[in-house]
Amino acid sequence: MPAIFTHEGKVEGVPGNYPLTAENLFRIGLALCTLWILDKEIEEPTLSIPETNFVTLALSVGFMNAGGSVNVGKGGDIKLFLQKGEIYVLEFQPLSETDIKKLESILFGRAPIPKKTGEDIGSFKC
């Protein structure tokens, strides 16, 4: 399976095709939130997305399933920058080179990524 992140730490692709499939975006959101909970020690991280569309919503569902909250157009612990065109470009800030390696380790590791259930699932705010 090809790498998800470019050497600049971005995710690029056509929505619906790898790496921007619904399943993969869900897993990226899950891993991103898990990284912030475990590594940054933020109990309920917040992801800020610029708008709602297939890409941002698939990512958001994974992020919320890990226990984080998602805001549209407001501040958060993590901010998603989205460049649309024939190829979509997703950039997360702040995200260091080390963070990217940790994310890929979570995504491609043998252990399942932890998921929250019930009331522990995060929220979505417009």
Swiss-Prot record:
Disulfide bonds: none annotated. It comes from the Bacteria. This is Uncharacterized protein aq_1627.
